[in-house]
Protein backbone atom coordinates (compact mmCIF):
# COMPACT_ATOMS: atom_id res chain seq x y z
CA UNK A 1 0.00 0.00 0.00
CA UNK A 2 1.61 3.19 -1.09
CA UNK A 3 0.81 6.84 -0.63
CA UNK A 4 4.17 7.79 -1.99
CA UNK A 5 5.99 7.48 -5.24
CA UNK A 6 7.55 4.06 -4.90
CA UNK A 7 9.47 1.87 -7.28
CA UNK A 8 8.97 -1.83 -6.60
CA UNK A 9 12.36 -3.44 -6.98
CA UNK A 10 12.74 -6.76 -8.76
CA UNK A 11 15.92 -8.00 -10.39
CA UNK A 12 15.99 -9.38 -13.90
CA UNK A 13 18.85 -10.36 -16.15
CA UNK A 14 16.92 -8.76 -19.00
CA UNK A 15 17.82 -5.32 -17.64
CA UNK A 16 21.51 -5.94 -18.26
CA UNK A 17 21.45 -6.40 -22.01
CA UNK A 18 24.70 -5.94 -23.88
CA UNK A 19 23.78 -4.49 -27.24
CA UNK A 20 26.53 -3.51 -29.61
CA UNK A 21 26.75 -1.12 -32.52
CA UNK A 22 30.21 -0.12 -33.68
CA UNK A 23 32.30 1.62 -31.01
CA UNK A 24 29.60 3.91 -29.69
CA UNK A 25 29.67 4.49 -25.92
CA UNK A 26 26.22 5.55 -24.78
CA UNK A 27 24.88 5.89 -21.24
CA UNK A 28 21.17 5.48 -20.68
CA UNK A 29 19.73 6.38 -17.30
CA UNK A 30 16.60 4.78 -15.87
CA UNK A 31 15.28 7.25 -13.31
CA UNK A 32 12.66 6.91 -10.60
CA UNK A 33 12.14 8.92 -7.43
CA UNK A 34 10.97 7.46 -4.13
CA UNK A 35 11.53 4.44 -1.98
CA UNK A 36 12.29 0.93 -3.14
CA UNK A 37 9.30 -1.14 -2.05
CA UNK A 38 10.34 -4.41 -0.45
CA UNK A 39 7.42 -6.78 0.01
CA UNK A 40 7.92 -9.69 2.38
CA UNK A 41 5.77 -11.77 4.67
CA UNK A 42 7.08 -9.76 7.61
CA UNK A 43 5.83 -6.54 6.03
CA UNK A 44 2.34 -7.83 5.31
CA UNK A 45 0.10 -7.11 8.27
CA UNK A 46 -3.18 -8.95 8.52
CA UNK A 47 -5.86 -6.36 9.15
CA UNK A 48 -9.60 -5.78 8.71
CA UNK A 49 -8.94 -4.18 5.32
CA UNK A 50 -7.77 -7.35 3.60
CA UNK A 51 -5.61 -7.62 0.48
CA UNK A 52 -3.47 -4.55 1.16
CA UNK A 53 -0.02 -4.22 2.73
CA UNK A 54 0.31 -1.51 5.36
CA UNK A 55 3.67 -0.31 6.63
CA UNK A 56 2.41 1.42 9.79
CA UNK A 57 -0.71 2.41 11.69
CA UNK A 58 -0.86 5.82 9.99
CA UNK A 59 -1.82 4.19 6.70
CA UNK A 60 -4.47 2.06 8.42
CA UNK A 61 -5.95 5.14 10.11
CA UNK A 62 -5.97 7.07 6.83
CA UNK A 63 -7.55 4.15 5.01
CA UNK A 64 -10.23 3.76 7.69
CA UNK A 65 -11.16 7.45 7.57
CA UNK A 66 -11.46 7.51 3.79
CA UNK A 67 -13.55 4.32 3.87
CA UNK A 68 -15.98 5.90 6.34
CA UNK A 69 -16.26 9.04 4.21
CA UNK A 70 -16.99 7.02 1.07
CA UNK A 71 -19.64 5.04 2.97
CA UNK A 72 -21.36 8.30 3.89
CA UNK A 73 -21.17 9.40 0.24
CA UNK A 74 -22.63 6.08 -0.93
CA UNK A 75 -25.57 6.46 1.48
CA UNK A 76 -26.17 10.09 0.50
CA UNK A 77 -25.13 11.30 3.96
CA UNK A 78 -21.83 13.01 3.22
CA UNK A 79 -23.25 16.52 3.56
CA UNK A 80 -25.54 15.76 6.53
CA UNK A 81 -24.91 15.88 10.26
CA UNK A 82 -23.80 12.24 10.04
CA UNK A 83 -20.37 13.42 8.92
CA UNK A 84 -20.26 15.91 11.80
CA UNK A 85 -20.60 12.99 14.21
CA UNK A 86 -17.89 10.94 12.51
CA UNK A 87 -15.01 12.26 14.69
CA UNK A 88 -17.06 11.38 17.80
CA UNK A 89 -17.65 7.86 16.52
CA UNK A 90 -13.98 7.38 15.68
CA UNK A 91 -12.87 8.74 19.08
CA UNK A 92 -15.69 8.10 21.57
CA UNK A 93 -15.65 9.47 25.11
CA UNK A 94 -13.02 7.84 27.36
CA UNK A 95 -11.29 6.24 24.38
CA UNK A 96 -7.51 6.08 24.24
CA UNK A 97 -5.90 9.04 22.55
CA UNK A 98 -2.26 8.06 22.23
CA UNK A 99 -0.01 10.99 21.45
CA UNK A 100 -2.73 13.60 21.97
CA UNK A 101 -3.57 15.64 25.07
CA UNK A 102 -7.24 14.69 25.18
CA UNK A 103 -10.10 13.12 23.26
CA UNK A 104 -11.24 16.56 22.07
CA UNK A 105 -7.89 17.14 20.37
CA UNK A 106 -8.13 13.73 18.75
CA UNK A 107 -11.58 14.56 17.40
CA UNK A 108 -10.30 17.84 15.97
CA UNK A 109 -7.52 15.91 14.24
CA UNK A 110 -10.07 13.51 12.70
CA UNK A 111 -12.07 16.50 11.44
CA UNK A 112 -9.16 18.26 9.79
CA UNK A 113 -7.71 15.05 8.36
CA UNK A 114 -11.01 14.67 6.54
CA UNK A 115 -10.45 17.86 4.54
CA UNK A 116 -7.70 16.60 2.19
CA UNK A 117 -9.57 13.31 1.77
CA UNK A 118 -12.56 15.36 0.61
CA UNK A 119 -10.30 17.15 -1.89
CA UNK A 120 -9.75 20.32 0.16
CA UNK A 121 -6.72 21.69 1.99
CA UNK A 122 -6.11 23.86 5.03
CA UNK A 123 -6.48 27.03 2.96
CA UNK A 124 -10.16 26.11 2.61
CA UNK A 125 -10.69 26.20 6.38
CA UNK A 126 -13.00 28.94 7.67
CA UNK A 127 -12.73 28.47 11.44
CA UNK A 128 -13.06 25.83 14.14
CA UNK A 129 -16.84 26.25 14.37
CA UNK A 130 -17.52 25.45 10.71
CA UNK A 131 -19.02 21.94 10.65
CA UNK A 132 -17.50 19.16 8.58
CA UNK A 133 -20.77 18.86 6.65
CA UNK A 134 -20.27 22.36 5.26
CA UNK A 135 -16.77 21.49 4.06
CA UNK A 136 -18.16 18.31 2.49
CA UNK A 137 -20.81 20.35 0.66
CA UNK A 138 -18.10 22.65 -0.69
CA UNK A 139 -16.07 19.65 -1.82
CA UNK A 140 -19.00 18.11 -3.68
CA UNK A 141 -19.87 21.44 -5.32
CA UNK A 142 -16.29 21.84 -6.50
CA UNK A 143 -16.19 18.24 -7.74
CA UNK A 144 -19.35 18.84 -9.77
CA UNK A 145 -18.35 22.18 -11.25
CA UNK A 146 -14.59 22.39 -11.43
CA UNK A 147 -11.23 20.70 -11.61
CA UNK A 148 -9.31 19.17 -8.70
CA UNK A 149 -7.12 21.51 -6.69
CA UNK A 150 -3.73 22.16 -8.25
CA UNK A 151 -1.77 21.80 -5.02
CA UNK A 152 -0.76 18.22 -4.40
CA UNK A 153 -0.01 17.98 -0.68
CA UNK A 154 -0.73 19.80 2.57
CA UNK A 155 0.13 19.73 6.27
CA UNK A 156 -2.72 19.35 8.79
CA UNK A 157 -1.67 21.86 11.44
CA UNK A 158 -3.91 20.31 14.13
CA UNK A 159 -2.22 16.95 13.57
CA UNK A 160 1.36 18.28 13.43
CA UNK A 161 3.07 17.69 16.78
CA UNK A 162 5.59 20.51 16.16
CA UNK A 163 8.62 18.26 16.71
CA UNK A 164 11.30 19.98 18.78
CA UNK A 165 14.20 21.18 16.64
CA UNK A 166 16.92 19.60 18.76
CA UNK A 167 19.17 17.32 16.77
CA UNK A 168 21.45 15.95 19.49
CA UNK A 169 20.73 15.09 23.11
CA UNK A 170 22.84 13.48 25.83
CA UNK A 171 20.93 10.66 27.51
CA UNK A 172 21.17 9.05 30.95
CA UNK A 173 23.58 6.55 29.43
CA UNK A 174 26.33 9.14 29.94
CA UNK A 175 28.84 7.65 32.41
CA UNK A 176 30.54 10.93 33.27
CA UNK A 177 33.82 9.54 32.02
CA UNK A 178 37.21 11.16 32.52
CA UNK A 179 37.99 11.43 28.80
CA UNK A 180 35.16 13.89 28.07
CA UNK A 181 35.65 13.41 24.33
CA UNK A 182 32.31 15.05 23.62
CA UNK A 183 33.32 18.24 25.43
CA UNK A 184 36.86 18.56 24.10
CA UNK A 185 35.92 17.84 20.47
CA UNK A 186 32.97 20.26 20.29
CA UNK A 187 34.01 23.11 17.94
CA UNK A 188 31.63 25.58 19.61
CA UNK A 189 32.09 24.68 23.27
CA UNK A 190 28.42 23.71 23.49
CA UNK A 191 29.02 20.60 25.63
CA UNK A 192 29.31 21.17 29.37
CA UNK A 193 29.70 18.94 32.41
CA UNK A 194 27.59 19.00 35.56
CA UNK A 195 29.85 19.74 38.53
CA UNK A 196 28.00 17.38 40.87
CA UNK A 197 27.40 14.34 38.64
CA UNK A 198 30.17 14.70 36.06
CA UNK A 199 27.64 13.98 33.30
CA UNK A 200 27.62 16.02 30.11
CA UNK A 201 24.85 18.26 28.76
CA UNK A 202 24.42 20.33 25.59
CA UNK A 203 23.70 24.04 25.40
CA UNK A 204 21.31 24.02 22.45
CA UNK A 205 21.57 27.78 21.95
CA UNK A 206 25.24 27.29 21.07
CA UNK A 207 25.07 23.86 19.41
CA UNK A 208 25.35 23.83 15.61
CA UNK A 209 24.27 20.17 15.25
CA UNK A 210 27.54 19.10 13.66
CA UNK A 211 27.35 15.66 15.30
CA UNK A 212 30.99 15.51 16.44
CA UNK A 213 29.99 14.83 20.05
CA UNK A 214 27.72 12.04 18.84
CA UNK A 215 30.64 10.39 17.03
CA UNK A 216 33.06 10.98 19.91
CA UNK A 217 31.10 9.31 22.72
CA UNK A 218 32.45 5.79 23.36
CA UNK A 219 29.22 4.78 25.13
CA UNK A 220 26.88 5.99 22.35
CA UNK A 221 25.13 8.05 25.01
CA UNK A 222 24.48 10.95 22.63
CA UNK A 223 21.55 10.37 20.32
CA UNK A 224 20.52 12.05 17.10
CA UNK A 225 16.87 13.19 17.16
CA UNK A 226 15.54 13.99 13.69
CA UNK A 227 12.44 15.88 12.65
CA UNK A 228 11.16 12.97 10.52
CA UNK A 229 9.45 14.93 7.74
CA UNK A 230 12.33 17.39 7.33
CA UNK A 231 14.86 14.57 7.52
CA UNK A 232 13.13 12.61 4.77
CA UNK A 233 12.76 15.48 2.30
CA UNK A 234 15.53 15.21 -0.32
CA UNK A 235 15.24 18.87 -1.34
CA UNK A 236 14.50 20.56 2.03
CA UNK A 237 11.10 21.75 0.87
CA UNK A 238 9.43 21.38 4.27
CA UNK A 239 10.20 23.52 7.30
CA UNK A 240 8.62 25.06 10.41
CA UNK A 241 6.84 28.40 10.60
CA UNK A 242 6.98 30.78 13.57
CA UNK A 243 4.48 28.57 15.42
CA UNK A 244 6.54 25.42 14.96
CA UNK A 245 4.12 23.94 12.41
CA UNK A 246 5.56 22.38 9.27
CA UNK A 247 4.81 23.92 5.88
CA UNK A 248 5.58 22.65 2.38
CA UNK A 249 7.14 25.12 -0.05
CA UNK A 250 5.47 24.34 -3.37
CA UNK A 251 8.28 26.13 -5.20
CA UNK A 252 10.77 23.60 -3.83
CA UNK A 253 8.67 20.43 -3.52
CA UNK A 254 9.20 17.63 -6.06
CA UNK A 255 6.13 15.68 -4.83
CA UNK A 256 8.01 12.51 -3.98
CA UNK A 257 5.77 12.00 -0.93
CA UNK A 258 8.57 10.98 1.41
CA UNK A 259 7.54 13.49 4.08
CA UNK A 260 4.03 12.05 4.11
CA UNK A 261 5.38 8.57 4.63
CA UNK A 262 7.82 9.75 7.31
CA UNK A 263 5.51 11.76 9.60
CA UNK A 264 4.77 9.58 12.68
CA UNK A 265 1.59 11.54 13.42
CA UNK A 266 0.16 11.34 9.91
CA UNK A 267 -0.04 15.11 9.63
CA UNK A 268 0.90 15.30 5.93
CA UNK A 269 -1.69 14.40 3.31
CA UNK A 270 -2.05 14.34 -0.42
CA UNK A 271 -5.13 16.14 -1.72
CA UNK A 272 -7.41 13.26 -2.69
CA UNK A 273 -9.44 13.22 -5.90
CA UNK A 274 -11.63 10.34 -4.73
CA UNK A 275 -14.89 12.28 -4.60
CA UNK A 276 -14.17 14.03 -7.90
CA UNK A 277 -14.13 10.61 -9.53
CA UNK A 278 -17.10 9.23 -7.57
CA UNK A 279 -19.25 12.23 -8.47
CA UNK A 280 -18.50 11.70 -12.17
CA UNK A 281 -19.55 8.06 -11.84
CA UNK A 282 -22.73 8.97 -9.92
CA UNK A 283 -23.72 11.47 -12.63
CA UNK A 284 -23.59 8.67 -15.20
CA UNK A 285 -20.59 10.01 -17.10
CA UNK A 286 -18.14 7.71 -18.83
CA UNK A 287 -15.17 7.21 -16.52
CA UNK A 288 -12.27 5.08 -17.75
CA UNK A 289 -9.55 3.74 -15.45
CA UNK A 290 -6.02 3.47 -16.80
CA UNK A 291 -4.17 1.20 -14.41
CA UNK A 292 -0.43 1.12 -13.69
CA UNK A 293 1.31 -2.28 -14.08
CA UNK A 294 2.40 -2.24 -10.43
CA UNK A 295 -1.18 -3.18 -9.54
CA UNK A 296 -0.10 -6.77 -10.12
CA UNK A 297 1.54 -6.73 -6.68
CA UNK A 298 -1.21 -4.94 -4.76
CA UNK A 299 -4.00 -7.49 -4.33
CA UNK A 300 -4.07 -11.17 -3.38
CA UNK A 301 -6.68 -12.14 -5.98
CA UNK A 302 -6.20 -12.49 -9.73
CA UNK A 303 -5.74 -9.33 -11.74
CA UNK A 304 -8.83 -10.26 -13.78
CA UNK A 305 -10.91 -10.17 -10.57
CA UNK A 306 -9.40 -6.81 -9.63
CA UNK A 307 -10.47 -5.39 -12.98
CA UNK A 308 -13.91 -6.93 -12.41
CA UNK A 309 -14.03 -5.00 -9.13
CA UNK A 310 -13.27 -1.80 -11.05
CA UNK A 311 -16.36 -2.50 -13.16
CA UNK A 312 -18.45 -2.90 -10.01
CA UNK A 313 -17.19 0.44 -8.69
CA UNK A 314 -18.62 2.00 -11.84
CA UNK A 315 -15.74 2.43 -14.27
CA UNK A 316 -16.80 2.25 -17.92
CA UNK A 317 -13.65 0.44 -18.99
CA UNK A 318 -10.19 -0.49 -17.74
CA UNK A 319 -7.11 0.06 -19.88
CA UNK A 320 -3.66 -1.07 -18.81
CA UNK A 321 -1.05 1.67 -18.75
CA UNK A 322 1.31 -1.00 -20.06
CA UNK A 323 -0.36 -0.45 -23.45
CA UNK A 324 0.70 3.18 -23.30
CA UNK A 325 4.13 2.09 -22.13
CA UNK A 326 4.81 0.51 -25.48
CA UNK A 327 4.23 3.87 -27.18
CA UNK A 328 6.69 5.39 -24.73
CA UNK A 329 9.18 2.66 -25.60
CA UNK A 330 8.87 3.22 -29.36
CA UNK A 331 9.15 7.02 -29.14
CA UNK A 332 11.97 6.92 -26.61
CA UNK A 333 13.93 4.38 -28.66
CA UNK A 334 13.73 6.64 -31.74
CA UNK A 335 14.68 9.66 -29.64
CA UNK A 336 17.64 7.75 -28.24
CA UNK A 337 19.01 6.99 -31.69
CA UNK A 338 18.47 10.58 -32.86
CA UNK A 339 20.29 12.10 -29.90
CA UNK A 340 23.08 9.58 -30.25
CA UNK A 341 23.55 10.48 -33.91
CA UNK A 342 23.55 14.18 -32.95
CA UNK A 343 26.51 13.52 -30.67
CA UNK A 344 24.76 13.69 -27.29
CA UNK A 345 26.57 11.46 -24.79
CA UNK A 346 23.69 10.35 -22.59
CA UNK A 347 19.95 10.60 -22.07
CA UNK A 348 17.71 9.97 -19.08
CA UNK A 349 14.22 8.52 -19.01
CA UNK A 350 11.30 10.84 -18.37
CA UNK A 351 8.50 8.70 -16.93
CA UNK A 352 8.84 9.87 -13.32
CA UNK A 353 7.27 13.31 -12.63
CA UNK A 354 9.25 13.66 -9.39
CA UNK A 355 12.45 13.29 -11.37
CA UNK A 356 11.25 15.90 -13.86
CA UNK A 357 10.50 18.28 -10.97
CA UNK A 358 13.95 17.59 -9.54
CA UNK A 359 15.67 18.47 -12.80
CA UNK A 360 13.53 21.53 -13.52
CA UNK A 361 13.92 23.02 -10.04
CA UNK A 362 17.41 21.94 -8.98
CA UNK A 363 19.46 20.82 -12.01
CA UNK A 364 18.10 22.93 -14.89
CA UNK A 365 21.30 22.51 -16.90
CA UNK A 366 20.38 18.83 -17.30
CA UNK A 367 17.00 19.48 -18.97
CA UNK A 368 18.43 18.92 -22.44
CA UNK A 369 19.47 15.40 -21.46
CA UNK A 370 15.99 14.35 -20.30
CA UNK A 371 13.91 12.46 -22.83
CA UNK A 372 11.03 14.50 -24.21
CA UNK A 373 8.89 11.40 -24.71
CA UNK A 374 5.55 11.30 -22.91
CA UNK A 375 4.99 8.95 -19.99
CA UNK A 376 3.04 5.68 -20.27
CA UNK A 377 0.17 7.41 -18.43
CA UNK A 378 0.05 10.07 -21.15
CA UNK A 379 -0.08 7.57 -24.00
CA UNK A 380 -2.57 5.34 -22.17
CA UNK A 381 -4.81 8.38 -21.65
CA UNK A 382 -4.64 9.10 -25.39
CA UNK A 383 -5.64 5.50 -26.14
CA UNK A 384 -8.58 5.83 -23.75
CA UNK A 385 -9.72 9.15 -25.22
CA UNK A 386 -9.57 7.80 -28.76
CA UNK A 387 -11.91 5.01 -27.69
CA UNK A 388 -14.07 7.18 -25.40
CA UNK A 389 -13.81 10.82 -26.59
CA UNK A 390 -16.19 12.18 -23.93
CA UNK A 391 -14.89 10.14 -21.00
CA UNK A 392 -13.01 11.27 -17.93
CA UNK A 393 -9.72 9.39 -17.58
CA UNK A 394 -8.53 8.26 -14.15
CA UNK A 395 -4.97 7.06 -13.64
CA UNK A 396 -4.77 4.41 -10.89
CA UNK A 397 -1.32 3.79 -9.44
CA UNK A 398 0.93 4.06 -6.39
CA UNK A 399 2.38 7.48 -7.07
CA UNK A 400 1.51 10.83 -5.52
CA UNK A 401 3.71 12.65 -8.04
CA UNK A 402 1.45 11.60 -10.92
CA UNK A 403 -0.99 14.24 -9.67
CA UNK A 404 1.58 16.89 -10.52
CA UNK A 405 1.85 15.49 -14.04
CA UNK A 406 -1.94 15.62 -14.43
CA UNK A 407 -2.01 19.19 -13.07
CA UNK A 408 0.68 20.29 -15.56
CA UNK A 409 -1.19 22.50 -18.02
CA UNK A 410 1.61 22.12 -20.57
CA UNK A 411 0.72 18.46 -21.15
CA UNK A 412 -2.43 18.26 -23.27
CA UNK A 413 -4.47 15.10 -23.55
CA UNK A 414 -3.30 13.58 -20.27
CA UNK A 415 -5.43 11.88 -17.61
CA UNK A 416 -8.02 13.96 -15.75
CA UNK A 417 -7.70 12.45 -12.27
CA UNK A 418 -5.37 10.27 -10.21
CA UNK A 419 -6.30 7.69 -7.58
CA UNK A 420 -3.87 5.66 -5.49
CA UNK A 421 -4.32 1.95 -4.83
CA UNK A 422 -5.28 2.65 -1.23
CA UNK A 423 -8.02 5.02 -2.36
CA UNK A 424 -9.33 2.37 -4.74
CA UNK A 425 -9.35 -0.20 -1.94
CA UNK A 426 -11.23 2.22 0.35
CA UNK A 427 -13.86 2.64 -2.37
CA UNK A 428 -14.12 -1.13 -2.78
CA UNK A 429 -14.59 -1.65 0.95
CA UNK A 430 -17.10 1.19 1.31
CA UNK A 431 -19.15 -0.11 -1.63
CA UNK A 432 -19.00 -3.73 -0.35
CA UNK A 433 -17.12 -4.98 -3.39
CA UNK A 434 -15.76 -8.46 -2.65
CA UNK A 435 -12.77 -9.20 -4.84
CA UNK A 436 -13.11 -12.99 -4.72
CA UNK A 437 -16.68 -12.77 -5.98
CA UNK A 438 -15.92 -10.42 -8.86
CA UNK A 439 -16.16 -11.76 -12.43
CA UNK A 440 -13.00 -11.78 -14.50
CA UNK A 441 -12.25 -8.84 -16.80
CA UNK A 442 -9.43 -9.72 -19.15
CA UNK A 443 -6.83 -7.20 -20.30
CA UNK A 444 -3.73 -7.79 -22.37
CA UNK A 445 -0.52 -5.83 -22.72
CA UNK A 446 3.10 -6.39 -23.59
CA UNK A 447 5.29 -8.08 -21.00
CA UNK A 448 7.90 -5.35 -21.40
CA UNK A 449 5.21 -2.74 -20.88
CA UNK A 450 4.27 -4.37 -17.59
CA UNK A 451 7.92 -4.47 -16.52
CA UNK A 452 7.95 -0.68 -16.37
CA UNK A 453 7.07 -1.12 -12.69
CA UNK A 454 10.36 -2.94 -12.11
CA UNK A 455 13.63 -1.21 -11.35
CA UNK A 456 15.30 -0.78 -14.74
CA UNK A 457 12.12 -1.71 -16.58
CA UNK A 458 12.01 1.38 -18.81
CA UNK A 459 15.58 0.94 -19.94
CA UNK A 460 15.15 -2.78 -20.58
CA UNK A 461 12.07 -2.15 -22.70
CA UNK A 462 13.76 0.59 -24.76
CA UNK A 463 16.85 -1.50 -25.39
CA UNK A 464 14.73 -4.52 -26.33
CA UNK A 465 12.79 -2.35 -28.78
CA UNK A 466 16.05 -1.22 -30.39
CA UNK A 467 17.24 -4.80 -30.58
CA UNK A 468 14.05 -5.93 -32.33
CA UNK A 469 14.36 -3.07 -34.85
CA UNK A 470 18.02 -3.96 -35.57
CA UNK A 471 19.20 -0.62 -34.12
CA UNK A 472 21.70 -2.20 -31.78
CA UNK A 473 23.89 0.05 -29.64
CA UNK A 474 26.55 -0.53 -27.03
CA UNK A 475 24.65 0.92 -24.09
CA UNK A 476 25.95 1.50 -20.61
CA UNK A 477 22.95 1.51 -18.29
CA UNK A 478 22.97 3.50 -15.05
CA UNK A 479 20.12 2.96 -12.60
CA UNK A 480 19.17 5.57 -10.01
CA UNK A 481 16.61 4.78 -7.34
CA UNK A 482 15.63 7.81 -5.28
CA UNK A 483 16.39 11.50 -5.58
CA UNK A 484 19.80 11.30 -3.90
CA UNK A 485 21.01 8.70 -6.40
CA UNK A 486 19.54 10.77 -9.24
CA UNK A 487 21.41 13.90 -8.17
CA UNK A 488 24.61 11.94 -7.69
CA UNK A 489 24.32 10.26 -11.09
CA UNK A 490 23.63 13.53 -12.89
Model-inferred region functions:
Residues 11-16, 23:
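Intrinsic low-complexity, disordered N-terminal segments enriched in polar/charged/small residues
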Residues 14, 26-28, 40:
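Compositionally biased, low-complexity intrinsically disordered regions
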Residues 3, 10, 26-29, 49-51:
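Aromatic (phenylalanine/tyrosine) cluster motif
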Residues 164-257, 261, 266-273, 280-285, ...:
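Glycine- and small hydrophobic-enriched segments that form the cores of compact globular domains
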Residues 35, 40-125, 131-132, 270-490:
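Iron-sulfur-associated redox domains of electron-transfer enzymes in respiratory
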Residues 3-6, 11, 35, 42:
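Low-complexity, intrinsically disordered or signal/transmembrane-proximal segments
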Amino acid sequence: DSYINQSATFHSDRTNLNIKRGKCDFSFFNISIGHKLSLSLQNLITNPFNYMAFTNNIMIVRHRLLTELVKLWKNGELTTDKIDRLPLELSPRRSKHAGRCCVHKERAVWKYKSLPLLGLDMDDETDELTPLSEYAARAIERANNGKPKDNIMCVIDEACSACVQINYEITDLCRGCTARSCQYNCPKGAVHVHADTGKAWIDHDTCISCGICHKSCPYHAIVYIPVPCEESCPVKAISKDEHGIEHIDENKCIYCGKCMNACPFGAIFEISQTFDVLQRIRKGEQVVAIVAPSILGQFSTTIEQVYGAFRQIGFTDIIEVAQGAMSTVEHEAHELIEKLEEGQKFMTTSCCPSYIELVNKYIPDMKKYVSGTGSPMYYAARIAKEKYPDAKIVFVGPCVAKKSEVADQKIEGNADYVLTYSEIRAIMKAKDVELEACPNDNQTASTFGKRFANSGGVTAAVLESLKESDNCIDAKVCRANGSQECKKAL
